[in-house]
């Protein structure tokens, strides 16, 4: 989603500046053009050479502002060049300058000369962050619709205290940049209550053996991340997802088997505006189960199976007129015909059909491709892309077509 995009990064003078090295590296690796501006204080923590090496382009500081070697004023050139502007770490000092429209260095001049969306990622001591003056300056900026906040995390700070003030992690910054680039800063899902299921379920035979599938939950997590970034209130019901992190701001409920997911859905589905069933629920379970671990020699020669609850059918039957229900269909070969049949059979509003027999698609991968089919008979193909990009395209489709 960042390939070919022009991303300008302003680095403030805080110890968290080192994290921005990882952001610049990831952006470059994903095909973005990156330019970096350092304040004089930032250069005391990370050198311009570091960012020059990572971005494959000279990093700029205040000394460059006054050099007569640029064909146009540097702050004008950079401000007009950028598709998006990240300021991280945003210090209390830089925040105060921007909030009052000061223009006394390269970074502050470039902010005033730009017209693109600006993502603010603050980092500072908790007491500083909570000061009335700091919050007043922040609200002053956020009154301008092109400014967007990636709030600081809580945790151990460089001052050896615990509290709110840690710079957002590089992965969080990357996700938010991608969302802003895709939406232009529009929080077009604000006010929506979205319920998402993700991951596989596991139906245990004994204490260690189970019937399941290779789903990792990456697609559902991408849907949750992107919906939250677009302003939705997201609840995620997920099966086992290993150590994959739950996106910030998302309410999560962990389950193991289909029966537990059924109970969670019964509680949460009536509260949602949109319900997206992206979980890969195991279709069957052992008809008989054992406590403890069965010795290998005692395993049954045949294993009677029983169906698990048809969760999407249950949700469909209980769906209210204002609710939107989206299903997923993972298939090999012809993915469209079975998906259309499932759409009709389950009375869905939309179904997303994705292949499991194509390279870099399906379970466990970071990318995917799909065909979206809706109840009106319309269908749209999504070419191979990251699962996060696909998630944004699904939301865009629902907003525009349904």
Swiss-Prot record:
EC assignment: 4.1.1.36, 6.3.2.5
Described function: Catalyzes two sequential steps in the biosynthesis of coenzyme A. In the first step cysteine is conjugated to 4'-phosphopantothenate to form 4-phosphopantothenoylcysteine. In the second step the latter compound is decarboxylated to form 4'-phosphopantotheine.
Active site (UniProt): 159
Named cofactor requirement(s): Mg(2+); FMN
UniProt-recorded Gene Ontology molecular function terms: FMN binding; metal ion binding; phosphopantothenate--cysteine ligase activity; phosphopantothenoylcysteine decarboxylase activity
Segments of this protein annotated with the region Phosphopantothenate--cysteine ligase: 194-402
Family: In the N-terminal section; belongs to the HFCD (homo-oligomeric flavin containing Cys decarboxylase) superfamily. In the C-terminal section; belongs to the PPC synthetase family.
Protein name (database record): Coenzyme A biosynthesis bifunctional protein CoaBC
InterPro entries linked to this entry: CoaB-like_sf, CoaBC, DNA/pantothenate-metab_flavo_C, Flavin_trans-like, Flavoprotein
TM regions (residue ranges): none
Keywords (A to Z) from UniProt: Decarboxylase, Flavoprotein, FMN, Ligase, Lyase, Magnesium, Metal-binding, Multifunctional enzyme
UniProt pathway annotation: Cofactor biosynthesis; coenzyme A biosynthesis; CoA from (R)-pantothenate: step 2/5; Cofactor biosynthesis; coenzyme A biosynthesis; CoA from (R)-pantothenate: step 3/5
Origin organism lineage: Bacteria, Bacillati, Cyanobacteriota, Cyanophyceae, Synechococcales
